[in-house]
Amino acid sequence: MIITLEYVVSAFDQTAVIEDLDRVLQTRAGRRLEYLSIAWTSLEAIIGVGVGIVAGSVALIAFGADSIIEVASSCVLLWWLAEGSMDRDRVAHRLVGGCFFALGVYITADASMDLLKGEAPRATYFGIIYAAVCVIVMPVLARAKRRVAAQLNSQALHADSHQSDICAYLSLILLLGLALNAVLDWWWSDPVAALCMLPIIIREGIAGLRGETCSHAHF
């Protein structure tokens, strides 16, 4: 069978079209993930701050404030996904790194205030359920972001997935803190555990501000 030059060129054109279509679909998947992330973390912020005020829990209020940073991070990623340029990817990656750093500031302020006041929040079983749901949802969202980030070769989306990982760890700390406070009256358990996470968060923030990849990080 004779393969003509026209046939070969046509095959290459079809391959290029398929690759372009795949990237469009992957970018749309990334946008959907970020819309979902914005919706979920906005709900986290409302519930966390609201329940925290009612229960007098600084940890819950801080966790809600963390969700605001998550929303900002997702908005940054939507900005990059709008065009997908490498320049935007680098800028977005640094902005996400700044969000990590801001997250560390929030946790430091929260934990220090809690330890200085020495006042335990009231037991809140709704808060415990809320934290447990976050522990389940955030790792699933982070894995989905990493999968799409690998397909798009986006460092910014990959960094954002690590921010979702950190949110999952914070929700686990929150869950343990609320549970220990409710069961054993250990008011100090939440701020001490939160401070233990600061080295990881600060390292990721510095890496992001330098424009370095976060793919080396392990949690």
Language-model features: locations:
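Alpha-helical transmembrane cores and adjacent cytosolic helix/loop segments
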Residues: I2-F219
